[in-house]
Amino acid sequence: MADGFATAPQDFKGVFTPEIEAQTAPVWEKVKHHVTPMEWRVQAPLIVEINRLKREKNAAILAHNYMTPDIFHGVGDFVGDSLALAKEAAKSDAQIIVQAGVHFMAETSKVLSPEKKILIPDLKAGCSLASSITGADVRLIKQRYPGVPVVTYVNTTADVKAETDICCTSANAVQVVEWAAKEWGTDKVILIPDEFLARNVARQTDVKIIAWAGHCEVHKRFTAQDIADMRAAWPGAEVLAHPECPAEILEAADFAGSTAAMNDYVAAKKPAQVVLITECSMASNVQAESPATQFIGPCNMCPHMKRITLQNIYDALVHEQYEVTVDAEVLDRARLAVQRMIDLPPPAVPARYDLVKARHHVDVELI
């Protein structure tokens, strides 16, 4: 939940001076392909003021991979996926954390940093996947499948994590599922709430998967025809897909893996042309670090992530508003599930999904 009363926002009226232009020049070099010069005259003073407020208030901003480039490159102290950001928040000396992401991410940061003030710039920044399941749903699932370990994707609320045996990310889901099956001495595991992630994991393991019909609205919209059209238009482009996409997308891709794995792939392989089958801003942000690579659509935009702006980040810092809290009992149990995952030996590299590996039978039971 989030506490506090919002103060009516008053747009920051900064002036684009030569000093601000010089100070923000390195950021401009990274965002200039995605931000117009006119937009930059508004954004640059905001970036300078937000960074000043961070120093004044001992605050840090966690910028998710799906943030717009002005946020990601301009004010993000830590950038990456939701779990990586929460872990960085826990290590940071900052007393105030502003979550430039959606609400479940702010909850995860609170779970790992209960002593810190966690702010979210917009209370309406939700998530279709996280809202697809509740803690009460998980309790009913456990009654239906007694003794079967519950593995929960980190893209869930603290209430759901609290009912979970261990959490996972898209990068380590196969590893966590196989660990849970071995630890519980069973051949089946409940993997919730993303149905497509569960089905894609099932293709990588012999463990039987019990899944929930939750979906990310961004990745669900992609179709195999999208990829076919892109290959026809750009025959040399390499296609990288996120495992929250339907299996037909992964089958049509050249590579599938987490956002971290995609980033590493582009950095290592340096493809001339690449298509990232994920949220739009991911390509925009990776492009700044890989200028020689041409990034081609399609992409789908997350309306929830895009609720976060420089202006409401500024408002959150100025007024220290929209603090995210988690009930103490829920927090302790949720932290146990996340910590179990963190304590597992990390893979040497972010996991990729083997698109060649053929399973004679993929056993997925949909709840």
UniProtKB/Swiss-Prot annotation:
- Going by the record, the broad EC class of this enzyme is transferase
Q: Name one GO molecular function term.
A: metal ion binding
* InterPro entries from the UniProt entry: NadA (IPR003473), NadA_sf (IPR036094), Quinolinate_synth_type2 (IPR023066)
Q: What keywords does the record list, in alphabetical order?
A: 4Fe-4S, Cytoplasm, Iron, Iron-sulfur, Metal-binding, Pyridine nucleotide biosynthesis, Transferase
Cofactor comment text: Binds 1 [4Fe-4S] cluster per subunit.
GO process terms (BP): 'de novo' NAD biosynthetic process from L-aspartate
Q: Might you give the EC number(s) for this enzyme? A: 2.5.1.72
Superkingdom to which the source organism belongs: Bacteria
Q: Where does [4Fe-4S] cluster bind?
A: C127, C216, C302
Which reaction is recorded as catalysed by this protein?
A: iminosuccinate + dihydroxyacetone phosphate = quinolinate + phosphate + 2 H2O + H(+)
Q: Where in the cell is it found?
A: Cytoplasm
Biochemical pathway: Cofactor biosynthesis; NAD(+) biosynthesis; quinolinate from iminoaspartate: step 1/1
A Pfam family cross-referenced in the UniProt record is NadA
Per the annotation, which location comes first and is thus the protein's main one? cytoplasm
Stretches assigned to coiled coil? none
Q: Which cofactor does it need?
A: [4Fe-4S] cluster
Q: Does the keyword Iron-sulfur apply?
A: yes
Which amino acids does the record list as binding iminosuccinate? H64, S82, Y153, V154, N155, S170, H242, P243, E244, T259
GO cellular component terms, alphabetically, are:
cytosol
Describe the task this protein carries out. Catalyzes the condensation of iminoaspartate with dihydroxyacetone phosphate to form quinolinate.
Family named by the database record: Belongs to the quinolinate synthase family. Type 2 subfamily.
Q: Which PANTHER family match?
A: QUINOLINATE SYNTHASE, CHLOROPLASTIC (PTHR30573:SF0), QUINOLINATE SYNTHETASE A (PTHR30573)
This chain belongs to which protein, by name?
Quinolinate synthase
Show the taxonomic lineage. Answer: Bacteria, Pseudomonadati, Pseudomonadota, Alphaproteobacteria, Caulobacterales
Instruction: Report the gene name.
Output: nadA
